[in-house]
Every structure is written in C-alpha cells, then in structure tokens.
Design a protein with these regions (language model features):
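A short, structured surface patch at a secondary-structure boundary
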Residues: 41-107, 112
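Solvent-exposed, charged interface segments at domain starts and junctions
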Residues: 4-8, 101-104, 118
Length: 136
C-alpha cells in the first residue's frame, strides 16, 4: 500500500474512529493540521473517492452529505447531494451542519475551504487530481 493511500485512510479513520482522551489531530495531504476534540460524527464528502473510502473503512454512518458525483456505494444514494466541483455550494454544505468536509484540490478552491473554516467547519483536502493521487 502506498504512503499516500495509507495516510489518507489513516486520516479518514481517525476522523470517524473511536474517541481518544486528548482529541485527534491529523494532517491532510496538503500538510494542513485538522484538530478535533473527538471523532467526527457529521462528515460531508465531496469526491467519489473520499465517499468510497469512508464507506470501506466503516464510517458510512458519519456521512451526512455527498458531492453530486458521489454515487457509490449504492447505500449512500439517500444522502443529501450538494453541488460540488467548480460550483461547490458552500450554503448547501453548511445547511447540513458538518463537523468535517472532505474535498479535493482538483475541484474545490482554497477560498471555498476558507469559507467553510470561517463557519466552524474543519476541512480536509485530498490530492485527487488523478488516479495516482488517489491510490498511490
């Protein structure tokens, strides 16, 4: 398993895993530190790869919303869909009251991440620009 994939899986598992006495601090693929007092129970994932990985590691119950291109696994089809990609809709995301938003540097902008953070949402940015960025 590559270091990038392991790091991404570790970040996601820590975001929705068992509570730790001292809270959780993880570093995303851009070197940004994300600190939570306890595991996230309300996550919006904007990219298909992030949705699939969260579900694969048993964190599907923490998902409260998904990007418009997130359609697998089928079990997430009932989740609210938010506009993602170049037209990511911050208001739609905030209406879901997430603790954490998982986004890609390919589709979302630093300005969008800052807007979410200004509204109290932790943002984890992945490097999903190509297949290698997701899986290597």
């Amino acid at each position: 398993m590559s270091k990038k994939l392991f790091a991404l899986l570790f970040v996601m598992l820590m975001l929705c895993g068992a509570a730790l006495a001292d809270g959780i601090t993880v570093t995303d693929m851009h070197g940004r530190e994300i600190a939570l007092d306890q595991p996230a129970t309300r996550i919006v994932a904007l990219t298909p790869s992030d949705c699939e990985i969260l579900c694969a590691i048993g964190c599907e119950d923490a998902l409260v919303g998904r990007g418009k291109y997130c359609d697998y696994p089928e079990s997430i089809s009932a989740l609210p869909v938010v506009q993602s990609g170049a037209e990511t809709n911050i208001e739609e995301i905030l209406a879901l009251d997430p603790q954490v938003v998982l986004m890609s540097d390919m589709s979302q902008t630093e300005e969008q991440a800052k807007l979410l953070e200004q509204n109290g949402v932790q943002v984890v940015i992945s490097d999903a620009n190509d297949i290698a960025g997701v899986y290597t």
